[in-house]
């Protein structure tokens, strides 16, 4: 057998070994065969859209191009927009219910998306929660902010507080778009801007860069999140974050050790803080009660991890 033929046989055996080894690899360690593709195509904007229960024309060049910018920015900010779509399945039902009860247009739920991306974040300026209340403003709308609890992170209470603020703006401007812009600019600031320019609506007012984009960002997220596949987001319902089943326990006495109390309920301090992000510490003192604390609805929901 010549050397060349010998090498050929060795190479063939090595190739066969690699193929067999690959076939024996457990599925859990194989790379996914799913192919992720991104398209550079952006759908044509509609001629009009329903926004805050009103038909809004998008034929105006300035309005159209400012909205188009925010569509592009958010369409290609895939990680953030994908998270918003996933989180919306968990939080939108609560937001929609409260907005309806408070008589505020449902589209204001998208304000939460641009403010916090549906998470309890703290801004560099100190604003917190889904609705990004400042610590000095929160108590004016009934939210407690102490070293122990921060109700800006309480989804239900902060949403009702936001509704009070939005409705206050609406009473001043008699227009939901202006009320929305005032959420960012402040009602006094928006009034001064309009009066100095002799106009009465946000779309006719020259604003600071942040507020100038604010309403259009909400409009863009509404279009994208209502029609995700049209903008290249293919997120199956089973991959979205479903609401966490919980029940409330009324607390009328101080709890010195919340971790111990949590274990007595069959859960943990970590889960208590997950379900109640407004609780900041390991206790509930007299200043925090009475209050309702959420716990998992049953042992199959967020139970204690065990190996």
Model region roles, listed by residue range:
Residues 126-147, 159-161, 166, 190-193:
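Substrate-binding/active-site groove segments that recognize
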Residues 237-266:
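Primarily a LysM-type cell-wall glycan-binding module
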Residues 166-193:
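Catalytic and binding regions of secreted/periplasmic enzymes and modules that target cell-wall glycans
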Residues 104-119, 179-185, 272-275:
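Short, functionally critical alpha-helical segments immediately adjacent to catalytic or ligand/cofactor-binding
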Residues 209-232:
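Catalytic cores of secreted or luminal carbohydrate-active enzymes
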Residues 5-103:
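An acidic, Gly/Ser/Thr/Pro-rich helix-cap/linker signature
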Residues 77, 81-92, 101-104, 123-131, ...:
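Solvent-exposed, acidic/flexible segments
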Residues 271-307:
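Extracellular LysM carbohydrate-binding repeats and other cell-envelope/extracellular binding modules
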């Amino acid at each position: 057998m010549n050397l060349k033929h010998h090498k050929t046989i060795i190479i063939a055996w090595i190739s066969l070994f690699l193929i067999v080894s690959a076939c024996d690899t457990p599925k859990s360690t194989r790379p996914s065969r799913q192919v992720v593709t991104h398209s550079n195509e952006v759908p044509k904007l509609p001629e009009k859209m329903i926004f805050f229960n009103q038909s809004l024309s998008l034929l105006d060049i300035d309005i159209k191009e400012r909205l188009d910018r925010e569509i592009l920015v958010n369409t290609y900010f895939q990680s953030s927009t994908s998270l918003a779509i996933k989180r919306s399945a968990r939080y939108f039902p609560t937001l929609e219910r409260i907005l309806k009860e408070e008589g505020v247009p449902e589209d204001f739920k998208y304000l939460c998306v641009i403010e916090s991306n549906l998470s309890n974040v703290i801004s560099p300026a100190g604003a917190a929660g889904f609705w990004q209340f400042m610590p000095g403003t929160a108590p004016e709308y009934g939210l407690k902010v102490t070293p122990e609890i921060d109700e800006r992170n309480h989804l239900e209470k902060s949403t009702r507080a936001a509704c009070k603020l939005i409705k206050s703006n609406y009473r001043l401007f008699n227009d939901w778009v202006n009320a929305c812009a005032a959420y960012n600019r402040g009602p006094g600031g928006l009034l001064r801007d309009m009066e100095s320019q002799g106009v009465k609506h946000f779309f006719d007012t020259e604003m600071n860069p942040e507020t100038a984009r604010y309403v259009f960002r909400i409009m863009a997220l509404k279009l994208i999140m209502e029609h995700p596949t049209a903008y290249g987001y293919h997120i199956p319902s089973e991959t979205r974050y479903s609401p966490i089943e919980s029940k409330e326990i009324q607390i009328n006495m101080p709890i010195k050790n919340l971790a111990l109390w949590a274990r007595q309920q069959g859960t943990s301090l970590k889960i208590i803080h997950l379900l109640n992000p407004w609780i900041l510490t390991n206790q509930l003192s007299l200043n925090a009660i009475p209050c309702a604390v959420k716990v998992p609805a049953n042992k199959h929901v967020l139970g204690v991890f065990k190996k």
